[in-house]
Regions:
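Positively charged n-region of N-terminal signal peptides that target proteins for export
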Residues: 1-5
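C-terminal motif of bacterial Sec signal peptides marking the signal peptidase cleavage site
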Residues: 17-20
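Short linear S-[DN]-x-LW-Φ motif typified by the pepsin-like aspartic protease active-site region
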Residues: 23-81, 85, 214-220
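Short, T/G/N/S-enriched strand-turn elements that build extracellular solenoid repeat scaffolds
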Residues: 32-34, 51-56, 73-77, 99-100, ...
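Repetitive beta-strand solenoid architecture
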Residues: 39, 48, 58, 80, ...
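Mid-chain, structured segments of secreted extracytoplasmic proteins
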Residues: 74-104
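Mid-length scaffold segments of soluble, non-membrane domains
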Residues: 142-143
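Short, surface-exposed interaction patches in beta-rich subdomains
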Residues: 150-220
Length: 220
């Protein structure tokens, strides 16, 4: 009997400790990064639990607006091959994940880029959406979301477009005609408006989703 009471007491203490952790407030600070687009050919963003909104900039610069805390931050660097990378890093402990996520505003990355000046755009994130405007890049676009949607207006890439979600939908318009593309697509547990396989195009379009719909039009 004493052993049972002791175990119940320890359980209650554990719940109290975890409840205390869940009410802890985290302070976020807004950060801003900018660079002249003449220095950048490729942008590669690798994030976790972040919504990523891509917009067009009003000039020839690239801008990134984001938020950091003492426990969650980003490493931004430009390599010798003109690749701008932004990668998520964290010092959060297990108990820091109790109580839900920070407000969406503090978990949103706003990327503003010039039209037609990038070679490639690569974005990965989890648990939130990726949104893009009507965008043209000279080489490739690659988007991946785990538990989120990919939404875009019109995408135009010189060579390759690759889009993938898990537990999310993919919606938008690809610029061109069906004859332009070699297509691979598959929607597991969802609807697919693209052919699963089509050969003969000089561009590559790959679209995959698990537990989501693919609603993509190809139009000139």
């Amino acid at each position: 009997m004493k052993k049972i009471i002791t175990m119940i007491g320890l359980f209650c203490i554990s719940i109290a400790i975890l409840s205390g952790c869940s009410t802890k407030q985290t302070d976020f600070t807004q950060k801003n990064y900018s660079v002249n687009s003449s220095q950048i050919q490729i942008i590669n963003i690798d994030a976790i639990d972040r919504k990523i909104d891509v917009e067009l900039s009003d000039d020839d610069k690239i801008y990134i607006d984001y938020y950091e805390s003492e426990q969650e931050f980003f490493n931004i660097a430009v390599s010798d091959d003109h690749t701008l990378t932004m990668s998520y890093d964290t010092e959060k402990q297990l108990t820091d994940y109790i109580g839900g996520n920070a407000p969406l505003q503090n978990r949103t990355i706003r990327l503003r880029i010039p039209q037609n000046l990038l070679s490639s755009l690569i974005i990965k994130t989890t648990n939130e959406d990726i949104t893009l405007p009507s965008l043209t890049v000279t080489d490739s676009v690659s988007m991946y979301v785990n538990h989120g949607n990919i939404q875009f207006d019109t995408l135009d890439a010189g060579n390759t477009i690759s889009l993938e979600t898990k537990n999310g939908n993919i919606n938008g318009t690809i610029l061109g005609s069906y004859d332009d593309f070699t297509i691979e697509s598959f929607a597991k547990k969802g609807e697919n408006h693209l052919p699963e396989s089509k050969a003969g195009g000089n561009k590559i379009l790959k679209v995959f989703t698990n537990n989501g719909d693919i609603q993509i039009d190809i139009k000139k």
